[in-house]
């Protein structure tokens, strides 16, 4: 037995030497003693490939092992495999069970235990303990020592050790004699090597390692003692006798070398002469050899010659960075004879790049393999299971149920997916509108179109009955299997029965067959990676259930605990890594990569804080914790400060990993447009290579030299974007290279591509303008007899397209089960009608109501109407019931103020919710348009009041609003506020029908129904408080400029005072103050005529098919601010600013003077 060390810098041929020796031995004696090539886990596949890629046609002696795989092999020979193996998923579930049972005993982690990711961190902590040979007893002993020194840091650390020791001890007790996890294998391997005849004959080659854990050192010690010969290859520049400086690039591998030598010497194992390889045999270019040799020199050793093998790439964004890399890969493969397998990307923050890598490499059709396991959590099958469990847990809340629905796994195999998705959208609309959850899922649903509070008692139509039946069929499709799952889970007595319930649920819905179909579809698309995911996920689910049954199958746990443990298992599931092809770009993690035979490396994302790594969280143990533990002689993994010293070595390995070309790239901003800075290493690299080649990615291609523009021409998908940029530049009068017209012609002449380029060209010259409808189509949309509301005309004047979307296309927002402002408005209006009707029935005037009566009437009115508002939303939850009380309070205040108005006013209500239209008290306001189309206006007026004066009957219109509002005559001029004056016009037009005689205009007023906060800065008596309260409810609008009419409206107004009811102030001489809102009878007539002209004009535009996207803009107000159709019209204020209809200020006084 002996130990030999092969050392040398990276690229000196250590791996090649090991492989050559093994191949020579196999060639000389194919059936000789075993040869074991021991490498890190991530290096096993490529090592097997390298071993078989030589002159050998096969082998029996040699095998490639990682430590774990070697443990399995030896335990199969010597015994120890009888215990059940727990995967990481099984370990997580067991830990979750222990945590749930011990939660009340936890000191520090009690609250954190419920947070996502806690079990993963806990498992990492216990793994670290095992790897560093730390036991629960050790933790308890250290905890006791810490308690004797009760500083704040030491107390917190002691609590951490107490909690983890308790969990660790429970975990070890559960594992003892029954189970084994991945970390136990190394301990068992160290124990069993002495009993293995296989190992006693084996020659060992260890390669690719830079450091080892204490557990691994235990195994290596046994290898040294019992194996005939062990060769260890290490990346080290010299066999130092003493520890180099802490900042030395090879400090880590020297420590490893020194510890391995000590183990050999302590066990009396002979150490052969160190084989030191001194020549760089990897790198083909001088600048790469210079970089390898002088990477860490201080001061910088410059390379003054032109540098072509090292390229620095700067990109505006991460996407631009990956697109630039993709173009370079295509160029290298197309023009320089590279294979995809010759190229590797090294990335530290893979998570930041994963999605953009997948998207861009798919567009460029670059085959790739990401050497990092993906979680299964986002797979639709796992999402369906998790959402189903959440639905059971939350009693079928909307969010959980539709998370499950949107995975498509509820659909039958013979149901078209597209049609069923449309059906589920309709089901979701109903669920959102009616607030379906809990027991409502099990009830028969009824369906009736909501026609307002007036139509709640209308009979159900045949169409509504058919839709109701369809809705209930869809409801049963979703809820029936969930109800069966819920029932079986609740009836289950043991963990086994709970798992059987989950399995039966999946089997009942034919999940295996559906996953097979998804796999086949992925294979047909050529997406082999996704196809393998669909293959793996079902087996992973079965394995998870098996693990649960093995660990907890006979235990009785609550449904909540079971679901929590299973959820923890799902969170730990990962897809296994099987490279789907041999010729593909390798995307590897910067820290863990082991590359071989790579011609070109892209070192990606070299930004500040990434490379070198910023000091980060050390998991459950902080950096201070780790230093304290080291002080108390308890050794765990190094703190981040210690790991920072290894950064130069990791960067060195990445920089020298390729033989021919090195790209170092970084981005200047991330996806959120946050600025990113280049790593300080970029400056060091430019200092070392002053003439390094630099590339910039993300600028418009037409700004680049022709040679660089050629790189943008790759394939039909990826080239389309740059071509569009070129055509846009040409459209803006920039000159573009003739090459791009060749590319354009290639698209046009290609049968499969010409339609795609036609769409692009149309988009290039697209203007966001809605076309005018032809007259016939407009007539079909709106009809020969158009029934409309006044507010519809206002909508047209705000933006014709909004009118077209609402009344032509009949688009509307999805109804959601919640109380919105329009619902509250409906309630207020209807409640006041109910109160007014009751007062009329009881012949009780408003002026005689007491405060108590106002309160009682308001309470009863809201109680009566609440069940009809938004599917009983006000009765659905405690929050909404509280809101109903608040609405009753608001109604009480409004009713009280209306009563006070009645006491002060000579006007009395003669109509509440007064309808006009066919079958209503008043006929519709009717106009005949130029083509014979009849325009009828229908609606309801909130309130009409009457008073008698010397000149005759006076009529005023009152509209209820949820806040104080005034009438802006500029908006009247531009047709944005027609309603109030149109209502006044209607009641005056049909006055004889309403009051039996002609009438005169008294005013148009807005009454606020709100809950104002009164601000007072001094003590006020009751009278003053009442005045202050009334002021908060002062009506806005305009009244007739007649003192007698004003006194009829507010009998308490005196010269020199302001009215508390209407927007008027009288001067001492009885004239109206400047800011009083008054209009003469002539001005009212003029405004009525203006409104009529505007209405006819809008009607004419409607039948002409006007649908322009032309929102108004008035100072800071635009039609787009609260428009529900913005996503439909896609009006872009930045691009389409010229399409605003700017409303210029109007001198209203001049206009009204005529």
Curated annotation (Swiss-Prot):
Gene Ontology MF terms in the entry: 4 iron, 4 sulfur cluster binding; 5'-3' exonuclease activity; ATP binding; double-stranded DNA binding; helicase activity; metal ion binding
A GO BP annotation: double-strand break repair via homologous recombination
Domain UvrD-like helicase ATP-binding positions: 1-284
PROSITE patterns: UVRD_HELICASE_ATP_BIND, UVRD_HELICASE_CTER
Residue positions binding [4Fe-4S] cluster: 799, 1120, 1123, 1129
The organism's place on the tree of life at top rank: Bacteria
Enzyme Commission number, as recorded: 3.1.-.-
The UniProt record lists the keyword Iron-sulfur: yes
Cofactor note: Binds 1 [4Fe-4S] cluster.
Ranges of residues in domain UvrD-like helicase C-terminal: 279-583
Function of the protein: The heterodimer acts as both an ATP-dependent DNA helicase and an ATP-dependent, dual-direction single-stranded exonuclease. Recognizes the chi site generating a DNA molecule suitable for the initiation of homologous recombination. The AddB subunit has 5' -> 3' nuclease activity but not helicase activity.
Protein name per the record: ATP-dependent helicase/deoxyribonuclease subunit B
Subunit structure: Heterodimer of AddA and AddB.
Organism: Anoxybacillus flavithermus (strain DSM 21510 / WK1)
Extra remark: Despite having conserved helicase domains, this subunit does not have helicase activity.
Keywords, in A-Z order: 4Fe-4S, ATP-binding, DNA damage, DNA repair, DNA-binding, Exonuclease, Helicase, Hydrolase, Iron, Iron-sulfur, Metal-binding, Nuclease, Nucleotide-binding
Cofactor: Mg(2+); [4Fe-4S] cluster
Binding-site residues for ATP, renumbered to this chain: 8-15
Family affiliation: Belongs to the helicase family. AddB/RexB type 1 subfamily.
């Amino acid at each position: 037995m002996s130990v030999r060390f092969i050392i040398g810098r990276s690229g000196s041929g250590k791996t090649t030497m090991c492989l050559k020796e093994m191949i020579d031995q196999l060639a000389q004696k194919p059936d000789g003693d075993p040869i074991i090539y021991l490498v890190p886990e991530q290096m096993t596949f490529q090592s097997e490939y390298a071993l078989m890629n030589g002159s050998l046609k096969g082998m029996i002696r040699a095998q490639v092992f990682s430590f774990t795989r070697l443990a399995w092999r030896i335990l199969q020979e010597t015994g120890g495999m009888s215990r059940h193996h727990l995967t990481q998923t099984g370990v997580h579930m067991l830990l979750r069970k222990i945590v749930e049972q011990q939660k009340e005993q936890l000191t520090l982690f009690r609250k954190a235990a419920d947070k996502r990711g806690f079990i993963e961190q806990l498992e990492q902590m216990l793994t670290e303990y095992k790897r560093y040979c730390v036991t629960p007893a050790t933790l308890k002993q250290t905890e006791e020592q810490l308690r004797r020194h009760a500083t704040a840091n030491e107390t917190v650390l002691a609590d951490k050790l107490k909690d983890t020791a308790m969990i660790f001890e429970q975990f070890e007790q559960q594992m003892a004699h029954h189970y084994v996890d991945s970390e136990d294998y190394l301990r068992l391997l160290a124990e069993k090597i002495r009993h293995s005849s296989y190992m006693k004959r084996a020659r060992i080659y260890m390669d690719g390692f830079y450091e080892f854990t204490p557990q691994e050192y235990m195994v290596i010690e046994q290898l040294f003692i019992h194996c005939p010969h062990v060769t260890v290859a290490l990346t080290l520049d010299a066999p130092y006798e003493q520890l180099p400086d802490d900042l030395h690039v090879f400090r880590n591998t020297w420590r490893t070398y020194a510890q391995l030598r000590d183990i050999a010497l302590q066990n009396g194992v002979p150490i052969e002469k160190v084989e030191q390889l001194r020549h760089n045999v990897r790198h083909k270019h001088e600048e790469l050899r210079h970089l390898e040799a002088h990477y860490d020199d201080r001061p910088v050793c410059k390379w003054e010659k032109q540098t072509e093998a090292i390229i620095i790439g700067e990109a505006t964004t991460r996407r631009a960075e990956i697109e630039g890399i993709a173009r370079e890969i295509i160029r290298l493969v197309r023009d320089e004879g590279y294979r995809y397998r010759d190229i590797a990307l090294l990335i530290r923050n893979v998570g930041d790049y994963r999605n953009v890598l997948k998207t861009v490499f798919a567009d460029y059709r670059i085959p790739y393999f990401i050497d990092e396991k993906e979680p299964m959590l986002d797979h639709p099958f796992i999402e369906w299971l998790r959402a189903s469990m959440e639905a059971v847990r939350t009693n079928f809340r909307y969010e959980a149920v539709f998370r499950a629905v949107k995975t498509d796994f509820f659909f039958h195999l013979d149901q078209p997916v597209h049609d069923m998705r449309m059906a589920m959208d309709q089901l979701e609309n109903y669920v959102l509108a009616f607030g379906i959850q809990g027991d409502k899922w099990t009830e028969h649903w009824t369906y009736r179109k909501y026609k307002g509070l007036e139509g709640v008692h209308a009979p159900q139509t045949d169409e509504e009955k058919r839709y109701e039946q369809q809705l209930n069929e869809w409801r049963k499709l979703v809820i029936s299997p969930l109800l069966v799952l819920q029932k079986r889970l609740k009836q289950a007595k043991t963990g086994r029965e709970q798992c059987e319930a989950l399995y039966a649920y999946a089997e009942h819905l034919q999940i295996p067959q559906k996953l097979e179909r998804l796999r086949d579809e992925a294979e047909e698309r050529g997406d082999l990676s996704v196809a393998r995911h669909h293959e793996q996920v079902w087996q992973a689910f079965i394995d998870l259930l098996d693990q649960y049954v093995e660990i907890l199958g006979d235990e009785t746990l609550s449904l909540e605990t079971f679901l929590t443990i299973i959820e923890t298992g799902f969170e730990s599931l990962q897809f296994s890594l099987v490279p789907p092809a041999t010729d593909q770009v390798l995307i590897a993690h910067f820290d863990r990569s082991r590359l071989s035979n790579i011609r070109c490396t892209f070192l990606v994302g070299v930004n500040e804080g990434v490379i070198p790594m910023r000091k980060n969280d050390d998991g459950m143990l902080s950096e201070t914790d780790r230093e304290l533990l080291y002080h108390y002689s308890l050794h765990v993994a190094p703190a981040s400060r210690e790991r920072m010293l290894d950064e130069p070595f990791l960067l060195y390995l990445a920089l020298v990993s390729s033989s021919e070309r090195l790209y170092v790239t970084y981005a200047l901003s991330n996806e959120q447009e946050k600025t990113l800075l280049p790593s300080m290493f970029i400056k060091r690299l430019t200092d070392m290579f002053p003439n390094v080649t630099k590339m910039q990615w993300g600028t418009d291609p037409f700004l680049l030299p022709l040679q660089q523009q050629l790189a943008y021409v790759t394939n039909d998908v990826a080239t389309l974007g740059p071509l569009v940029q070129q055509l846009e530049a040409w459209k803006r009068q920039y000159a573009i290279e003739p090459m791009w017209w060749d590319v354009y012609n290639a698209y046009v002449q290609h049968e499969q591509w010409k339609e795609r380029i036609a769409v692009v060209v149309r988009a290039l010259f697209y203007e966001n303008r809605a076309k005018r409808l032809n007259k016939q189509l407009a007539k079909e949309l709106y009809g020969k007899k158009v029934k409309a509301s006044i507010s519809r005309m206002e909508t047209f004047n705000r933006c014709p397209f909004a009118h077209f979307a609402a009344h032509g296309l009949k688009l509307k927002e999805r109804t959601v089960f919640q109380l919105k402002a329009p619902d509250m408005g409906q309630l207020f209006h209807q409640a006041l009608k109910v109160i007014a009707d009751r007062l009329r029935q009881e012949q009780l005037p408003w002026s005689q109501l007491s405060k108590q009566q106002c309160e009682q009437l308001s309470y009863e009115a809201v109680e009566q109407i609440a069940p009809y508002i938004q599917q009983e939303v006000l009765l659905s939850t405690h929050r909404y019931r509280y809101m109903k009380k608040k609405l009753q309070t608001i109604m009480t205040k409004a009713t009280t103020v209306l009563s006070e108005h009645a006491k002060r006013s000579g006007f009395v209500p003669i109509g509440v919710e007064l309808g006009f239209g066919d079958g209503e008290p008043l006929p519709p306001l009717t106009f005949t348009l130029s083509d014979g189309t009849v325009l009828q206006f229908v609606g309801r007026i909130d309130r009409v009041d009457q008073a008698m004066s010397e000149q005759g009957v006076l009529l005023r219109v009152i509209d209820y609003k949820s806040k104080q509002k005034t009438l802006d005559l500029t908006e009247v001029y531009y047709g944005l506020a027609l309603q109030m004056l149109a209502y006044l016009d209607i009641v005056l037009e049909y006055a004889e029908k309403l009051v039996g005689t002609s009438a005169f205009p008294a005013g148009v007023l807005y009454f606020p129904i709100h809950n104002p906060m009164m601000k007072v800065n001094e003590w006020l008596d009751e009278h003053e408080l009442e005045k202050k309260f009334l002021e908060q409810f002062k009506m806005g609008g305009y009244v007739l400029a007649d003192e007698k009419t004003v006194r009829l409206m507010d009998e308490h107004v005196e010269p020199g005072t302001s009215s508390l009811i209407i927007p008027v102030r009288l001067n001492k001489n009885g004239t109206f103050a400047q800011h009083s809102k008054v209009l003469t009878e002539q001005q009212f007539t003029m405004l009525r005529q203006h409104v009529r002209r505007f209405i006819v004009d809008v009607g004419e535009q409607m039948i002409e098919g006007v649908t322009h996207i032309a929102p108004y803009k008035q100072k800071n107000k635009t039609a787009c601010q609260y428009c529900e159709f913005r996503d439909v019209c896609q009006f872009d204020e930045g691009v389409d600013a010229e399409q605003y209809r700017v409303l210029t200020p109007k001198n209203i006084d001049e206009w009204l003077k005529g």
